[in-house]
Amino acid sequence: MVPSAGQFALFALGILLAVCQALENSTSALSADPPIAAAVVSHFNDCPDSHSQFCFHGTCRFLVQEDKPACVCHSGYVGARCEHADLLAVVAASQKKQAITALVVVSIVALAVLIITCVLIHCCQVRKHCEWCRALICRHEKPSALLKGRTACCHSETVV
C-alpha cells in the first residue's frame, strides 16, 4: 500500500512538531511529579523600601537568617546585585531561536516541494492525456524510442 501525499505530509508535519517540542523542552525536568511544598517558615522576606534599588537587573529578597539583602537575577544577568550581563546566556538563547527558526523554514519549504511533487505525479498518472502533462513528458522523451519501432509516449504513431 502506497501512502498518499496527504498522509505523507501529515507524517512530515508530525515529525516537525515533535522536533520543535523536543528543542523547546530540552532543559525541563524528566519527571512529572508535583512540586514538593515549601516549609511553612520561609528563609526569605520582601526587601524593605530602603533596599528597593539594591538589585540592578533582578528581584530583591531579604535573607532572614543572615539579615541582609540578596538578588534573584533576571535571565541573562549574574552577580551579587545582578550587575553583570551573562553574554553566554544571551548568545545561547539567540542561537537556539535561530536554529528553531531555520528548522521551521526549511521544513515548510521541503513540505511545499513534497506536496507539489506529489500533486504533479498524481496529475500525470491520472490524466495522461492532459496537454500540460503530455508537454512535460514529451520534453524529456528521447528519439531513440521512435527508432526502435516502439510507440511514442506522446503520440500514437509508431515508426517502422
Swiss-Prot record:
GO terms for biological process: cell surface receptor signaling pathway; epidermal growth factor receptor signaling pathway; positive regulation of cell division; positive regulation of cell population proliferation; positive regulation of epithelial cell proliferation; positive regulation of MAPK cascade; positive regulation of mitotic nuclear division. GO terms for cellular component: extracellular space; plasma membrane. Disulfide bonds join 47-60, 55-71, 73-82. Residues 1-23 form the signal peptide. Residues 43-83 form the EGF-like domain. Residues 24-98 are extracellular. Residues 24-39, 90-160 form a propeptide. Residues 125-160 are cytoplasmic. A lipid is attached at residues 153-154 (S-palmitoyl cysteine). Keywords: Cell membrane, Disulfide bond, EGF-like domain, Glycoprotein, Growth factor, Lipoprotein, Membrane, Mitogen, Palmitate, Secreted, Signal, Transmembrane, Transmembrane helix. One of its GO terms (molecular function) is epidermal growth factor receptor binding. Interacts with the PDZ domains of MAGI3, SDCBP and SNTA1. The interaction with SDCBP, is required for the targeting to the cell surface. In the endoplasmic reticulum, in its immature form (i.e. with a prosegment and lacking full N-glycosylation), interacts with CNIH. In the Golgi apparatus, may form a complex with CNIH and GORASP2. Interacts (via cytoplasmic C-terminal domain) with NKD2. TGF alpha is a mitogenic polypeptide that is able to bind to the EGF receptor/EGFR and to act synergistically with TGF beta to promote anchorage-independent cell proliferation in soft agar. This is Protransforming growth factor alpha. It comes from Sus scrofa (Pig).
